[in-house]
Structure formats: structure tokens, C-alpha cells
């Protein structure tokens, strides 16, 4: 592992490295310590950003680039430009004031990484670049929202499909079962709410009427 320092002053895109990534295959990693901003009492600025680059199998020719971010002040996006053959320029997007970051990098014996201590800057993503994939590593600092994990927020939301409490749901449709998979409530049409006990239709509530069935 090799360490150096880089400074990324503005908010935008920076060409932080040029890599040689032979096909079938090779791997390179770049890790940045520190993030956008340097304010005392702002622990999120002591950020970690990790780039993992992996060459393909030659069909098609190319690389995969992933950015793993651990803080809101870490790098935001990654992209690359294939300049020739197996050579690629690697770009990241990061916020302002990313000064004096520690950069560590490593690569397999058939690859090479040249890190740029004073990277070229662009306010926008290079037009001929390919976007990589960004993943957020959730922690006590970066907690997922309900939407991030496919949950409903405490303020409410829409559940698509049947709901069951303590069991599976045999009623299907827009229904709620409780404890027994065929005992509960089901919406069976516009304004129609049915009650089931052991899959027996017992009560129907509709506009202007309520019917007790099977009594």
C-alpha cells in the first residue's frame, strides 16, 4: 500500500488517478481519508472514501468502478474515461474544501495506479466519462431512511399487498390477518369491508348497511 496526500479545493469533479487495468483481470483500490471541510467539532468531515476498480473479462472490454462512502463529507460519485487500451482516467465528485487528504492505493501485479497530487478540476462531470456505482455504508453517522431499506416511515405510508400479524396471509388482496392466516379483514370492493374467521365470511360492512353472515 502506497500513501500520499492530495488537495481537492473546489466542489466538483477531479481526475485523481490514471490507472492501467489489463482485462481478465486486474484490481486497484484507492482510499481517501478526510473529506469536504475542516471545521472543528464536525466529525463527519473526518471521512473515509473507498474506490474499488475491477477490470472485466475482455468481452466486453472495460472496467467496473465502485465508490463506498462512509460519511456525508466523503466523495459523492466516481466516473472514468478510457483514454487508450487498458488505460483509464479516474474521476471523483466531492464537496468544497477537501484539503490535505491522505490517499492510499494498491493494485495487483499486472496493473498500475498513478495518483495525481494536484488533480485536474471540472465543475461538471466530463462529457465522455462513464459513471460508476456509489454505495453508502450505513452507520450511526449515516443512518438509512425508511425508503432506503424499503420500510414505511413512522409518519405513515402505503403498503402494497396483504399484511399479516404473527402468521402468513391466506386471505390475499387488500387484507389484514391477525394470529390466524385466514382470520381478519379484507377490502372486497369499493366501500366494502369484510370480516373473516377461519376463512368463513362472517360480516360485511358497506355504505349504509352491515350484514352478519352465517349466524
PLM features per residue range, with description:
Residues 1, 133-178, 182-215:
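Fibrous stalk/shaft segments of extracellular and virion attachment machinery
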Residues 1-46, 72-80, 154-156:
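Surface-exposed ligand/attachment interfaces on beta-rich extracellular proteins
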Residues 8, 31-44, 52-56, 83-86, ...:
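Short, flexible beta-strand-to-coil junctions
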Residues 24-27, 84-87, 159, 207-209:
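Short, solvent-exposed coil/turn segments at beta-strand boundaries
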Residues 28-30, 88, 183, 193:
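Residue-level detector of short, conserved catalytic/binding motifs and their immediate flanks
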Residues 37-44, 92-106, 169-171, 182-184, ...:
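Short, surface-exposed beta-strand/loop "edge" segments at domain boundaries and coil↔beta transitions
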Residues 53-71:
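Terminal beta-strand-rich extracellular "head" domains
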Residues 71-74, 83, 87-151, 192:
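A signal for long, low-complexity, Ser/Thr/Asn-enriched, surface-exposed stalk/shaft
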Amino acid at each position: 500500500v502506497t500513501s500520499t496526500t492530495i488537495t481537492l479545493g473546489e466542489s466538483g469533479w477531479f481526475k485523481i488517478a490514471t490507472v492501467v487495468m489489463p482485462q481478465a483481470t486486474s484490481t486497484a483500490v484507492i482510499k481517501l481519508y478526510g473529506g469536504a471541510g475542516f471545521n472543528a467539532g464536525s466529525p463527519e468531515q473526518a471521512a473515509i472514501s473507498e474506490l474499488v476498480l475491477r477490470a472485466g473479462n475482455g468481452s466486453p472490454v472495460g472496467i467496473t468502478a465502485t465508490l463506498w462512502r462512509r460519511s456525508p463529507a466523503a466523495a459523492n460519485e466516481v466516473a472514468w474515461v478510457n483514454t487508450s487500451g487498458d488505460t483509464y482516467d479516474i474521476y471523483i465528485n466531492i464537496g468544497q474544501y477537501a484539503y490535505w487528504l491522505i490517499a492510499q492505493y494498491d493494485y495487483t501485479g499486472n496493473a498500475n495506479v498513478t495518483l495525481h497530487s494536484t488533480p485536474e478540476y471540472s465543475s461538471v462531470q466530463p462529457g465522455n466519462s462513464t459513471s460508476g456505482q456509489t454505495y453508502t455504508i450505513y452507520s450511526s453517522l449515516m443512518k438509512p431512511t425508511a425508503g432506503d431499506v424499503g420500510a414505511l416511515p413512522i409518519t405513515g405510508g402505503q403498503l402494497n399487498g396483504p399484511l399479516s400479524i404473527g402468521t402468513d396471509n391466506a386471505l390475499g388482496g387488500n387484507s389484514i390477518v391477525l394470529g390466524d392466516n385466514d382470520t381478519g379483514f379484507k377490502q372486497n370492493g369499493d366501500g366494502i369491508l369484510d370480516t373473516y374467521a377461519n376463512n368463513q365470511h362472517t360480516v360485511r360492512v358497506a355504505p349504509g348497511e352491515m350484514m352478519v353472515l352465517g349466524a
